[in-house]
From Swiss-Prot:
Gene name for this UniProt entry: ileS
Protein keywords: Aminoacyl-tRNA synthetase, ATP-binding, Cytoplasm, Ligase, Metal-binding, Nucleotide-binding, Protein biosynthesis, Zinc
InterPro entries in the record: aa-tRNA-synth_I_CS, aa-tRNA-synth_Ia, Anticodon_Ile_BEm, Ile-tRNA-ligase, Ile-tRNA-ligase_type1, Ile-tRNA_ligase, M/V/L/I-tRNA-synth_anticd-bd, Rossmann-like_a/b/a_fold
Tagged with keyword Electron transport: no
Organism: Leptospira interrogans serogroup Icterohaemorrhagiae serovar Lai (strain 56601)
EC numbers for this chain: 6.1.1.5
Co-factor: note: Binds 1 zinc ion per subunit.
Cofactor: Zn(2+)
UniProt name for this protein: Isoleucine--tRNA ligase
GO CC term, one of those recorded: cytosol
Length: 914
């Protein structure tokens, strides 16, 4: 229209869209100013103040490590949380989330030591802790900037840091309450141990990677017998110095098997064939041996001067090996349990750095993994090695050093999983939590069912000290409720540094004496708490208590947190509250590259949310991308997918721009009453009502990808392709104050406002920009989701939908005419529409309305003798495109019967132009 109208004397009378709303978003440059406006206007605080007294919704933020900048996975996590809080607020809830940061622990300490380089050896513990605190503080600031740049709402004076004195005091306090209630004990048990970092690891700090281990079959001589042995299989030869027994299963059948050399070996009947296949040693069964007979056997250790005993345990299976399990209670959980039942002390001749101690003098000072070849050679020299090969398997590694871990028995502090029926109570509570996706309950149940006691202590510098003391006179450990409460108060006032700056006597209540010997001389312990305990007590430190229900409505983190934060939060809450800390747990998958590989700097396949997305496209594009994902599964992303999302954003923006342009000169105050609106506009308001209802339901169900799909479809098809096309003539060519134009403008106003509010949680900048461009004074975030149920009109929808079935047939018929160069604009056409079931469309809708719906000049039930330009049909309708004989109106381009000659205006346009 525009090119023709440049030469058209009536072009100035046509009400073309007019708006200052820019076509080019320029998000990267313009968003920062809006961020500052939100902050200075305290919009997030006002959102909550406006909804005080409403139903509360609390999303508890799982604290990321204050270590490095946010990566793409972080951006997904934080943006989804922000979408949830904003959508809940717009839905009328008092919605709140306090962002937090995990500030203690190995991730930060290791990075600081790495930054120090050679100076690390010269750096004392006090200076190291100071550097760790400064490092964490620096990245809390940087990540906070990222959070704002993601267009997330948060209050900078309402955050939590696990290294703040108040939080540290709460950690000590909760530890004390757990101790007081019998859930915490000190014991010597095998735990995952990092020989690189010289500290214990919890289950949540373990990652499994492929690892090649030696696979050996070893003969243990039976005491008092000649040429009779028990055959064991192990992939950890270095643990053999700690062997105290061989474990069998009473449900498995065992026998003596003779080899070609005449030796007899005890092994499980069900594994004899497998052993022969692996070792190449022929085995012939000699006789069976019962469990009672096995129980009295004793075995000579292969190279230590001691006896190994028979043990029994259900963990022994026929999955691999010989059915006779080498047992070192100091180097394995199952080994420890069966050893404990038999009265064996856990024995581990290995120090903190993985070197043998003087309890194994033959290899004292040698690292355990380095000792494997020498132990194998020792067995070979003694004639006790039946077979040796290499074995690749999944093996536990440290999450920080990425190096293999060992099991090692050391004195540690533990949380009792089975005290006071806690495990059973927790499993029951898990069933009452909503897990999204639903498979989350199976995953966490399986972990909770089998998890060993939680090792709470660590042997590092940067963390909250366990307030335990040792009597210098008798060596008794001293810790009680009074001393913990005393220390908690000190930490609340001065932070954990007081543990290191003050003497033991000053950290204990006056008059404290050893409960065993009465001495008043103590020394401080060296253990700190597991960093997972820090974040695990965050529901106590951050959230308010609710009567008989969890303090948080929602936890949302990556699916790896089923073994991490979801559990570390669950145990203290169940122990002290008797209920879980969360009502609902929602998880997301990993963010991978487009080939399904993990993103990493070394592979060069990473996408930086700031440099690669925000600085190029803007944060609204990043947020729209997040909303497009079904984040419950792992997510593949490449730069091409971001480009596609940016193109979809452009379509949404153009929809907003078209709405604003057509509302030039029309305000909400000029809206017509509902009962005065045209049927076509009422029909599309009814469709808007259904769209809004669906979107709000999708927000409620955290199905943001469904919103993305519906939004694109609504903007590009329902509005741009259909409704805007239908009302273009009315909006451009009817008189500004005509009832028909005002009816459509009223509908457009409602559509614009509704779209603005519905998209605000996702497209936060754009929605606010549109809201202001529409003349609104307050923020879009201070509105509520509209309740448009009264616009829902089923009868009207059925009437229009029955007619719109033919629109697709009409458009195909028109396209055929265009392709054959018989037609330009659709307004140059008339139509003959025949329903094959005899339905008369003009009985459903007036002829004038049909012309608007199909954007043509005339609609006929039967061709009045006009030339046929094209034809198309389907099983329901046939359509002929006709060439009107009437002259075209030079202003609106319609061919109407009230035009007498070329160049004259139609009656409608005459009345408008005057």
């Amino acid at each position: 229209m525009s090119e023709t109208q440049k030469e058209n004397p009536y072009s100035s009378t046509v009400l073309l869209p007019k708006t200052d709303f820019p076509m080019k978003a320029d998000l990267a440059k313009r968003e920062p100013a809006q961020i500052q406006s939100w902050k200075s206007g305290q919009i997030f605080r006002k959102m909550k103040e406006q909804r005080k007294g409403k139903k509360e919704f609390v999303l508890h933020d799982g604290p990321p490590y204050a270590n490095g900048n946010f990566h793409l996975g972080h951006s997904l996590n934080k943006i989804v949380k922000d979408i949830i809080i904003k959508s809940k607020s717009l839905a009328g809830f008092y919605a709140d989330m306090i962002p937090g940061w995990d500030c203690h622990g190995l991730p930060i300490e290791v990075q600081v030591l790495k930054n120090l380089g050679k100076k690390a050896r010269e750096t004392g513990p006090e200076e190291l802790r100071r550097l760790c605190r400064n490092y964490a503080e620096e990245f809390v600031g940087k990540q906070g900037e990222d959070l704002s740049r993601f267009l997330c709402f948060w209050e900078e004076d309402r955050i939590y840091k696990t290294m703040s004195p108040g939080f540290e005091a709460k950690i000590v306090e909760v530890f004390g309450e757990l101790f007081q209630n019998g859930y915490v004990y000190r014991g010597k048990k095998p735990v995952y141990w990092s020989i690189d970092l010289a500290t214990a690891h919890a289950e949540a700090e373990i990652e499994y990677y492929p690892h090649v281990s030696p696979s050996i079959y070893v003969k243990f001589p039976i005491v008092g017998e000649q040429k009779k042995f028990c055959l064991i299989w192990t992939t950890t030869p270095w643990t053999l110095p700690a062997n105290l027994g061989i474990c069998f299963n009473r449900k498995i059948e065992y026998s003596f098997f003779k080899t070609e050399s005449g030796e007899e070996l005890i092994l499980a009947d069900g594994l004899a064939e497998s052993v022969t296949s692996t070792t190449g040693v022929s085995l012939n069964k000699v006789k069976s041996i019962s469990s009672d007979e096995l129980s009295v056997l004793k075995f000579q250790h292969p190279f230590m001067d001691r006896i190994s005993i028979s043990l029994f345990g259900d963990h022994v299976t026929l999955d691999a090996g010989t059915g006779c399990v080498h047992t070192a209670p100091g180097h394995g959980q199952d080994d420890y349990k069966v050893g404990l039942a038999a009265g064996l002390e856990p024995f581990s001749p290995v120090d903190d750095y993985g070197k043998y101690t003087d309890e194994f003098p033959l290899m004292q000072g040698k690292k355990v993994f380095d000792a494997n070849p020498e132990i194998i050679q020792l067995l070979k020299d003694k004639g006790l090695l039946l077979h040796h090969s290499e074995f690749e398997h999944s093996y536990p590694h440290s999450w920080r050093s990425k190096k293999p871990l060992i099991f090692r028995a050391t004195p540690q502090w533990f949380f009792k999983m089975d005290f006071n029926e806690l495990r059973e109570k927790s499993l029951s509570a898990i069933d009452g939590v909503q897990w999204i996706p639903s498979w989350g309950i199976t995953r966490i149940r399986s972990m909770v069912e089998t998890r060993p006691d939680w090792c709470l202590s660590r042997q590092r510098n940067w963390g909250v000290p366990i307030p335990a003391f040792t009597c210098e006179s008798c060596g008794q450990t001293h810790i009680d409720d009074v001393s913990i409460q005393f220390f908690t108060k000190m930490v609340r006032e001065k932070g954990i540094e007081i543990w290191y700056s003050e003497k033991a006597a000053d950290l204990l209540p006056p008059g404290t004496k050893c409960g065993k010997c009465g001495s008043d001389s103590f020394k401080k312990g060296n253990d700190i708490l597991d960093v997972w305990f820090d974040s695990g007590v965050s529901s106590f430190a951050v959230l308010g208590e609710r009567k008989d229900e969890p303090p948080a409505d929602l936890y949302f983190e990556g699916s790896d947190q089923h073994r991490g934060w979801f559990q570390s939060s669950l145990w203290p809450s169940m122990a002290l509250r008797g209920i879980p800390p969360y009502k609902t747990v929602l998880t997301h998958g990993y963010v991978l590259d487009e080939k399904g590989h993990p993103m990493s700097k070394s592979l060069g396949n990473g996408i930086d949310p700031t440099a690669d997305v925000i600085q190029i496209y803007g944060a609204d594009i990043l947020r729209l991308w997040v909303s497009s994902l079904d984040f419950r599964d792992d997510i593949k992303v490449g730069k091409e997918s971001l480009k596609i999302v940016s193109e979809q954003y452009r379509k949404i923006r153009n929809t907003f721009r078209y709405l604003l342009g057509n509302l030039d000169g029309h305000t909400s105050e000029q809206n017509l009453p509902f009962e005065e609106l045209e049927e076509l506009d009422l029909f599309y308001l009814s469709k808007l009502s259904q769209f809004a209802e669906d979107v709000i339901a999708n927000y409620e169900a955290y199905q943001f990808h469904q919103i993305y799909q519906k939004l694109i479809l609504f903007c590009t098809v329902t509005l741009s392709q259909d409704y805007f096309d239908m009302i273009r003539d009315r909006m451009y060519c009817d008189a500004r104050n005509s009832k028909t134009r005002k009816s459509s403008a009223t509908a457009l106003q409602y559509i614009l406002e509704t779209l603005c509010i519905l998209t605000a949680p996702i497209l936060s900048f754009t929605a606010e920009e549109v809201w202001v461009s529409n003349g609104k004074k307050d923020s879009v975030f201070l509105q509520n989701f509209p309740d448009l149920k009264f616009w829902k009109n089923q009868n009207l929808e059925e009437k229009f939908e029955s007619v719109l079935q033919v629109r697709e047939v009409v458009q195909k018929a028109l396209e055929i005419a265009r392709q054959e160069n018989k037609l330009g604009k659709s307004l140059e056409a008339g139509l003959e529409i025949v329903s094959k079931n005899g339905t008369n469309l003009t009985k459903i809708l007036p002829k004038e309305t049909l012309e608007i719906l199909f954007v043509v000049s005339q609609v006929h039930e039967k061709n009045p003798g006009l030339d046929v330009l094209s034809f198309y049909e389907n099983e329901k309708f046939s359509v002929k495109v006709l060439k009107p004989v009437q002259v075209e109106c030079p202003r609106c381009w319609r061919h109407t019967e009230d035009i007498s000659k070329e160049g004259d205006l139609c009656g409608r346009c005459k009345s408008v132009v005057g």
